[in-house]
Every structure is written in C-alpha cells, then in structure tokens.
Amino acid sequence: MDIECDIRKINKLNYNNENEIYKLKKLNHPSIIKHYDIDEKKSEKNVIIYQESINGGISIDKFDNNNFFSQEVIREICEQILLALRFMDNHQIVHRDLNCSNVIIFPETLTIKIIDFGVTKTNFLNQDYQSPEVLKSNNFTHKSDIWSFGFILLKMIDKSLNNIPDDLPTEQFDFLHSCLATNLSDRLDAQTLLHHPFIINKPILRFSKSMKLISSPKKQFELVNKTEHEIILLTNGTSETFYLNKNESCKIKISTIDLYIGVRFDDGAILSSPRPTKLIEQEGTDINSFIIDQSCLMAHNITFPNISFFESISEII
C-alpha cells in the first residue's frame, strides 16, 4: 500500500551525515515526524528524505497569537513538545534547529509534529533560539533544545517577545526561567519540566468538533470538583466497524484508532482529553481483559473510579 509522504531535500555539500538521520528512521513517537527513507544516490546534488505528510498542519509561526494561543492551548502544546523532547533525549537525539517554524500544529485535534531536524553542517537557527553554549562553542545538547523550546513558548505568548516579561503568571514565569537559564546546570531537562506546575496543573480542553461520538455508555464518574457527569468515548477516526462491547466475550483485533475520553455536562457541553488514550492488552482474547490506559488521563484532573468499564474497542473477526 502506498504511503502519502513529503520529500525534504538537503544539499549534499551541506549534509552532515554522522548517521544522525538514520537514527531518526528508528524513532516512533506521535509528536515526531516519521522518516520513512533516505536516498543519498538518487540525486547528484541532494540527499532525499522521505517523511510523513503534514497535510492539514500549520507551523506555530503562522498562527495569530490572540486568536489561537490561549493559556490552555499553550500548556497543551508545551506538554506535547516536552514529551517529544524527553523521548529524543532517551534516544540520544538532539534536534539542533528547534523553532516555531519546525513545530506543526494540527488545529482540529490540537496535536503536534516536530519536523526538520538539523542534519546540516550549517546552523540556520535565529540567534534567539540558540542557547549560550551553542553561540559560544556550537555545543549542541538536549538542553540546547530546551532553550529553543523556551523561546517557542515566548513566541506563543507574544510574537514580539525576546525576553521574559515580569507580568506573566507565576507558574509560567518560573517555567520560562527554568527553560532559559544561562547556566546549563540550572536549565531543567524535559523530564523535570513535565512535572512543573505549569504543565501538571493545566486544565482539560474543550472537545474538538472534528471528533466523532462513537459510544455513550450510561456510566457516571467524578471530576475533581466531585460533580458527576456522563462518560463518553470519542474518536477522530472513521472506521464504522469499531464499537464498545460491554457484555460479550469474543475474538477481537485491536485497532490503532485514536480514542479520547470525554465528559458530557448537563448543559450538553463536551470536554475531552487533548491526546488519545491507549488500549492495553492484559491477557487472552476476552474483551473483558482489555482496559484503557489511565496514565494518559492523570494530567487532565479526571478521576475514574472504575476505568475497566471500558473493556475495549473491538472488531469481530
């Protein structure tokens, strides 16, 4: 089956191989663009990189800050970038060219893709995005990506900002200082920043109209304010064969369909987790042996007393 992809060309005279681009082929993370193949022989002048299509996405620098980047949206985007940076750190990958034009947002689902990793000999970064150690000695580390990330956050707050304003909310102010610390030992890594109050205290976001309601089990759960609302299950996929089966046991096949846990309030308003949950296989093929991963929900201030009620999204075979 053919895969829709984009093509990136890099002039061979400016191509810094060192196997870095081949490491990228092995990365598999929802917020990092997939690199399908690299062809160094097809063109005499260019290295050809075949990568995941980003149709429907918009780079951060193309957005109108006032109309899109609310505090809630900024926190959600920051968390997704940090999750990707933590993953890269664990795989010893440094982006080297992280800036607003290299973070793509898909507005309908509020998800992101980090693109255009720096695999060239020349550093094209705007100096604002370059950490002090990069400017001084061209020394790139995972913490130089954190500095670049800090400037992305500044630009989401206000495109005109080049320094941290004093009038920011306390959590955001402290978070930015932790990203833009001149001293490397004071600059926090992605793992630590993910536990900063600016991230862990972010609210749940409103349901995207692009999602489709595929099930509404009559089950109640509690929000942190102790009011009860209806659990709903949503997806932005289109497969009609997937459904929630509560009572029957049968052979099933797990799909890669994205699932979102949602809340329907009495007035009809719907809230949803901004990122998909995961299905975990516990044992066998019994529908009752599947539960939804709770770790994706913990940051959204939602408590599920009996999450195993969602046994599975399944397809009969």
Swiss-Prot record:
CC annotations in GO: cytoplasm
Q: Where is the signal peptide?
A: none
Q: Note the SUPFAM superfamilies from the entry.
A: Protein kinase-like (PK-like)
Xref: InterPro entries = Kinase-like_dom_sf, Prot_kinase_dom
Residues forming the Protein kinase domain are: 1-199
Q: Which Pfam families match?
A: Pkinase (PF00069)
Q: Which Gene3D superfamilies match?
A: Transferase(Phosphotransferase) domain 1
Biological process according to GO: intracellular signal transduction
Q: Which GO terms describe its molecular function?
A: ATP binding; protein serine/threonine kinase activity
Record note on domains: The protein kinase domain is predicted to be catalytically inactive.
Q: Which family does it belong to?
A: Belongs to the protein kinase superfamily. Ser/Thr protein kinase family.
Protein name (record): Probable inactive serine/threonine-protein kinase DDB_G0268656
Species annotation: Dictyostelium discoideum (Social amoeba)
